[in-house]
Amino acid sequence: MLSGDIPPNQTVYLRNLNEKVKKEELKRSLYALCSQYGRILDVVALKTPKLRGQAWVVFSEITAATNAFRGLQEFDFYGKRMRVQYAKTRSDCLATEDGSTAPKEKRKKQEEKAAEKKRRAEEAQQSGPNAAAQSNGTGYQASRLGKTSQEPPAPPNNILFIQNLPAETTSMMLQILFQQYPGFREVRMIEAKPGIAFVEYEDDSQSMVAMQALQGFKITPYNPMAISYAKK
């Protein structure tokens, strides 16, 4: 079906997605990827046999959906080229199950939001002033983002230090975001230190572009990324 046959609307339909990706990771990755185009109301991805490899993203504005439609066509997502079109109707993303399950889905979303708030509170308690600046086994040391006036921020270089990541963030989620900018090399995460990561580019001018573009970007509705240069 040609996307041109369907009028623009708030919901984009994504297909040719990697079926091996777990449902929750898929939803989080799609949220992180699509949030740069506008405010997201919902991401729906089900693992039933008929709906594998597909997802729906509902934006608050048609213009946001249009930007995603244009920007994500053929995007390399978990090793497969994404196919994007507008949903036939908004109900395409809401009627994927029998209507009687709607209250259950609503309760599930409310529970997920409550769990996310709880995780944020726990992460805030665990993140002491030294958590982000300790040596971490990667050969780099995180800059402290000005937490102490005695320690100046690291000078520009090709490696970015990312903080305030939700605990469920994966390296693939970050790769999907940062590989959109020229010169991307790799993402490094530390299993023993959730919530932080290092992203390497070919040179400092390329890392600066990515930093400026993604500073404060929210991988989830509650976690704006804090980006600085890594200390070598």
Curated annotation (Swiss-Prot):
Domain of life according to the entry: Eukaryota
Signal peptide: none
Biased segments, Basic and acidic residues type: 108-123
SUPFAM superfamilies per record: RNA-binding domain, RBD
Pfam families on file: RRM_1
GO BP: mRNA splicing, via spliceosome
A molecular function (GO) term: RNA binding
PROSITE patterns associated with the record: RRM
InterPro entries in the cross-refs: Nucleotide-bd_a/b_plait_sf (IPR012677), RBD_domain_sf (IPR035979), RRM_dom (IPR000504)
Keywords per UniProt: Cytoplasm, mRNA processing, mRNA splicing, Nucleus, Repeat, Ribonucleoprotein, RNA-binding, Spliceosome
Compartments (UniProt record): Nucleus, Cajal body; Nucleus, Nucleoplasm; Cytoplasm
Residues covered by region (Disordered): 90-159
Family indicated by similarity: Belongs to the RRM U1 A/B'' family.
PANTHER family: U1 SMALL NUCLEAR RIBONUCLEOPROTEIN A/U2 SMALL NUCLEAR RIBONUCLEOPROTEIN B
Subunit note: Component of the spliceosome where it is associated with snRNP U2.
Name assigned to this protein: U2 small nuclear ribonucleoprotein B''
Protein source organism: Oryza sativa subsp. japonica (Rice)
